[in-house]
């Protein structure tokens, strides 16, 4: 029995993943032609194995990490230099401002001084033209004062005084031969102190006086006098002081002196025995 061999073969499909067709996208299954004749006694070929599954698409690569920005060493130093320059410029501007302020102040003072000087000059010129000259400047009056201290080598009357060393003072008054000479008439306060002392008391009367000499008077004029009686205990050591002081109207050329009754009993220490005056 003959079998008909003209029955159609089943369609066979080939897959070509690498081939590309202008009208089909990649990976499309194309059918094989059905008109391929089968040979006699040829068996039907086994069906082709199924195509292997397509590998999964590779994972998308991660984007590269951004590189850290490189630090620019020059930026730090440049900023520091700019800051220093800014402060230097600021200090210079401040100094310039202070200098201008001082200059303005000095110019203002100079202008005021010139104005006051011109006003004084104008006033003096007007006074000269009118005939009323400005009064002369007042002279500072020299103070009339004297303070003399005891002189240990004094051996005669009237008492001599120290007028150079120690705590002495002479101004506007002369000292001549134990006396103070008045140069200007006026009111004066005259004072004198004498310190007496002895090893053994004899109770001799002691006197202390200030007197004045002037060519107008025929004899000495006693101004002040002090007398001491019974001032100590007989036979014992003793010390006593006598002080005189008063205000007098003295005239020019008056000479003032001090006299005591017992010169040998006088202690001439500068703080104990002295003579002076001053004008009121």
From Swiss-Prot:
Q: Does this entry carry the keyword Protein biosynthesis?
A: no
Region forming the signal peptide: none
Residues linked to a glycan: 183, 249, 259
Which cysteines pair up through disulfides? They are: 201-232
Q: Which SMART domains match?
A: TNF
Specify where it is mainly localized. Answer: membrane
Where is this chain compositionally biased, Pro residues type? 43-69
GO CC terms on record?
Answer: cytoplasmic vesicle lumen; external side of plasma membrane; extracellular exosome; extracellular space; lysosomal lumen; nucleus; plasma membrane
Q: Where is this site: Cleavage?
A: 80-81, 128-129
Enumerate the GO terms in the molecular function aspect.
Answer: cytokine activity; tumor necrosis factor receptor binding
- THD domain ranges (all copies): 144-280
Ranges where the record places region Disordered: 20-70, 117-155
Q: Where are the transmembrane segments?
A: 81-101
Membrane topology reported for the UniProt record: Single-pass type II membrane protein
- List all topological domains (Extracellular): 102-280
Membrane side Cytoplasmic: which residues?
1-80
Keyword annotations: Apoptosis, Cell membrane, Cytokine, Cytoplasmic vesicle, Disulfide bond, Glycoprotein, Lysosome, Membrane, Nucleus, Repressor, Secreted, Signal-anchor, Transcription, Transcription regulation, Transmembrane, Transmembrane helix, Ubl conjugation
The family annotation for this protein states: Belongs to the tumor necrosis factor family.
How is this protein organized at the quaternary level?
Answer: Homotrimer. Interacts with ARHGAP9, BAIAP2L1, BTK, CACNB3, CACNB4, CRK, DLG2, DNMBP, DOCK4, EPS8L3, FGR, FYB1, FYN, HCK, ITK, ITSN2, KALRN, LYN, MACC1, MIA, MPP4, MYO15A, NCF1, NCK1, NCK2, NCKIPSD, OSTF1, PIK3R1, PSTPIP1, RIMBP3C, SAMSN1, SH3GL3, SH3PXD2B, SH3PXD2A, SH3RF2, SKAP2, SNX33, SNX9, SORBS3, SPTA1, SRC, SRGAP1, SRGAP2, SRGAP3, TEC, TJP3 and YES1.
Report the protein name in the record.
Tumor necrosis factor ligand superfamily member 6
Species, as recorded: Macaca mulatta
